[in-house]
Amino acid sequence: MISAGVDSKDLAKRGESLIRQSTNRYLTTVKIAFRAKQRRFDDFDGLLEESSVKPVHRAIVELSDEQDQPDLLPG
């Protein structure tokens, strides 16, 4: 999913896309922060192997992927 290094330009484009396609910028920012917090605690619990990527970067990539490819979501 996420390589060891996340390209900063790609990350910026993904973040801009999330904000641009949202109806509420504040809620999108809160969603990113909440997801990053979850990932940080998952790192502490040892549930995630990819600790080289910052949680906020991982959150932006995950939310962007969910937005762009909704067929990846379970259910």
Swiss-Prot record:
GO molecular function: DNA binding; DNA-directed RNA polymerase activity
Record's keyword terms, sorted: DNA-directed RNA polymerase, Nucleotidyltransferase, Transcription, Transferase
Any one of the GO BP annotations: DNA-templated transcription
InterPro entries named in the record: DNA-dir_RNA_pol_omega, Pol_omega/Rpo6/RPB6
Keyword Transferase recorded: yes
Broad enzyme group: transferase
Catalytic activity: RNA(n) + a ribonucleoside 5'-triphosphate = RNA(n+1) + diphosphate
Entry EC no(s): 2.7.7.6
One cellular component term from this protein's GO annotations in UniProt: DNA-directed RNA polymerase complex
Family as reported in the entry's similarity comment: Belongs to the RNA polymerase subunit omega family.
NCBIfam families hit by this protein: PRK00392.2-5 (NF001574)
General function of this protein: Promotes RNA polymerase assembly. Latches the N- and C-terminal regions of the beta' subunit thereby facilitating its interaction with the beta and alpha subunits.
Subunit and interaction comment: In cyanobacteria the RNAP catalytic core is composed of 2 alpha, 1 beta, 1 beta', 1 gamma and 1 omega subunit. When a sigma factor is associated with the core the holoenzyme is formed, which can initiate transcription.
UniProt name for this protein: DNA-directed RNA polymerase subunit omega
Organism taxonomic ancestry: Bacteria, Bacillati, Cyanobacteriota, Cyanophyceae, Synechococcales
